Amino acid sequence: MLYLIKLGKPGWLMWTNLVLTVYFSLVVCLLWRAFRLQLKVNLYSYDTIFYFGFALFILSLAGTYVYITFHCFQNPQSFREAQTIYTLLHSAKNYMLLTAPFLLLFAASLFISNIMLIRHEGFRFVNVLGIILSFLLIAGQVLIDFLDYRAAVYGQQSLWENLLINLLAAFYLYFECMIIGSAVADVIAAKNEAEKDRDFLIILGCALKKDGTPTPLLRGRLDLALQFRNAQLEESGKEACFVVSGGQGADEVQSEAASMQAYLLEQGIPHGQILAENRSVNTLENMLFSKEIIDGVRKNGKVAFFTTNYHVFRAGLKAEQAGLDAVGMGAPTKWYFWPNAAVREYVGLLTEHRRKQAIILFTVAVIYSALTFLAYT
């Protein structure tokens, strides 16, 4: 259809704009419906991020074509076929421009929180991930704007220059959509709350103090699990069994499970109500080994897991991988700690789904390459 517009077929311009408006509007509705369904069926999924992130982008396209179609029907002579094609071709750049205020605010927040994190926690590579991401986000926008400015000053862009800019914009579009989708999924997952009918409460371990006692971060997870257990006991009268999960690091005097078990005992939880999993060295093993213990006690028990707010979504993904049906809850952390930790989780999420992302990026690259060549034919 776009090729027929390019050939100048009479009457096709208005109707193609209308078809594109309807098409993109339907895609937005389908993506939003899929996102809502995903929240009910399986919140902890890469698809949750994808559906929301790209729904916003397609919504911007649908809105643009609503505007074009309305004015095209009002004054057909004022519109040319190039506007329809170039709206699609420059959609990635236009979306970056539309979301630039959000990106600027997001990057500034990451930068400030990282500076505070370094002041409190010291300089380590993992503590500057937010600064690196902030720089990349701003640098991408500046680079694309510079290339467009250069073309405006020195004349029309060549096919290959335009292709390079559009592919760069498409690359940034993808990761921007994933950042937005990931941020929304993280917030929803962190605010999620399990029903007060759980049989098992898994508490995910993390680094201990030098003396082997829980750090404030780990105490936050333990206290949240205790609060939930007490609230459930009061509301439904149902007692839950704690599963403390975490092995022993090379620099730790005891396993994280042993440290958590001692803390729960100090809070008055009976020894027989605590199951210890002390072999795991990562989140996936936390879930796998905890599931083994739970299945040995009671098959198909209702499970909740407790971690820190920034880690709930990715921990939920690991639970899905382990075949564990569980609802996650997140303990609060210091304001300057969450953004950088969320970036670390985001990077981890991307590296774990390389094949799926490669397919999506390749598809996006093919689409924008085809549109670029079409615009120059």
At which residue positions do the language-model features occur?
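A structural signal for short, hydrophobic/glycine-enriched beta-strand patches
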Residues: A169, A183-A341
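Extended hydrophobic blocks
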Residues: M1-E195, G296-K302, F306-T377
